[in-house]
């Protein structure tokens, strides 16, 4: 839907539309992560305090909104982890631990993000492929960054990609069990286990 031009109380139509989009994404995260609430456009609009007319201003449908939520979470995970690694110094082990620690810290700060991106997205048929694509992307990034930190091992690029996928897939299952409460572990224990696994795969 096109955004009408015009300034209201010093805020342009484009800025108001952008603010409404943020409200819808935030509301979708809240509704989608709540196991007691059915994720519908009506529920999301009610949570956001917006009419359905404004929903279609930003999104073509519910699946498009949920995909936007997933994309934002994935981008935040990638950026947060990369920044933490950059701040950890030159030691490979410190970088690995900082990167994984930042990811786990993000889940502690807002567990909804892990639940939505890793757990709940599996239940939405149209988002399963997007979830797979995002995990493959994160696996690729893990392969590139870990090899950069540790140096060449003589393995092929395909072997490194396979190791990255193995790590990310295992990490997804680990986080799922942790968020579901079927795995009892502290954040430090999760970070320790994941760091050992990643370093072991690339050495």
Explain the meaning of each model-derived region.
Residues 23, 31-64, 68:
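Helix-turn-helix
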Residues 81-88, 117-121, 149, 178-182:
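Secondary-structure edge/capping motif, primarily at the C-terminal ends of alpha-helices
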Residues 83-109:
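Hydrophobic alpha-helical connector segments
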Residues 1-7, 105, 140, 144-148, ...:
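C-terminal peripheral helix-coil segments that are non-catalytic and often amphipathic
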Residues 1-19, 150-157:
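N-terminal intrinsically disordered/low-complexity leader segments
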Residues 108-128, 143-146, 176:
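Amphipathic alpha-helical segments used for helix-helix packing
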Residues 16-28, 44, 69-77:
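Generic hydrophobic, amphipathic alpha-helix propensity
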Residues 125-151, 161-173, 196-199:
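Amphipathic alpha-helical packing segments from all-alpha helical-bundle domains
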